[in-house]
A protein has these predicted regions:
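Short Cys/His-rich micro-motifs in 6-15 aa windows
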Residues: 88, 149-156
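Broad hydrophobic/π-residue packing in well-ordered secondary structure
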Residues: 86, 118-124, 144
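Active-site beta->alpha loop and helix N-cap motifs at the rims of alpha/beta catalytic domains
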Residues: 135-138, 152-154
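Ferredoxin-like iron-sulfur electron-transfer modules
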Residues: 119-137
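Hydrophobic scaffolds flanking metal-cofactor catalytic centers in soluble metalloenzymes
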Residues: 1-81, 85-114
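Short cysteine-rich clusters marking metal-coordination/redox-active sites
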Residues: 46, 80, 131-134, 145-148
Length: 156
């Protein structure tokens, strides 16, 4: 069964986020992120964009402090594609270009979500961000699997 909390409101798959993976999978990854951001390991936690709360990650512009989430909440919207400014939004375009560098097409993802193909999309993303060696979930930005240490091959 897929976890719908991992449907990012901008079209990003939250299951590939380093914060989410550290919180769910790896105490050592959680500790290294905590050290980097001068936090306690307990503060490195997130259940995905659909489940943000006061205990969620909030360092910088991520998680509960995400400007996209705040914008959508202020407009009473769930996803970027619902906004009348979606096609011309500078914030979205900037984020989409960053995501494109790791092989993520936010517009394609949002099109699948809009078409009601959320579960199909979540299954595809889960498979895409899984280590080919140990079959465990990994993060977008890791070069090696945090489970088995295998160099990750990405389908971009």
């Amino acid at each position: 069964m897929v976890n719908k909390n991992l449907v990012g409101r901008c079209g990003l798959y939250c299951g590939g986020c380093r914060i989410y993976r550290a919180y769910k999978d790896s105490e050592s990854l959680r500790q290294s992120i905590a050290k980097r951001y001068k936090l306690t390991p307990e503060e490195v936690r997130c259940e995905g964009c659909q489940a943000l709360n006061e205990q969620s990650w909030g360092k910088g512009g991520w998680g509960k402090n995400c400007k996209t989430v705040k914008c959508l909440n202020a407009k009473g919207l769930n996803f970027c594609y619902e906004c009348e400014n979606y096609e011309t939004c500078e914030r979205f375009e900037k984020w989409a270009s960053i995501c494109a560098k790791i092989g993520v097409n936010l517009r394609e993802n949002l099109a699948m979500i809009k078409a009601g193909r959320v579960e199909e999309w979540l299954r595809q993303e889960e498979k895409r961000w899984t280590c080919q060696n140990c079959n465990q979930p990994t993060s977008f930005d890791l070069k090696k699997c945090h489970w088995c240490g295998t160099k990750l091959k990405r389908n971009r």
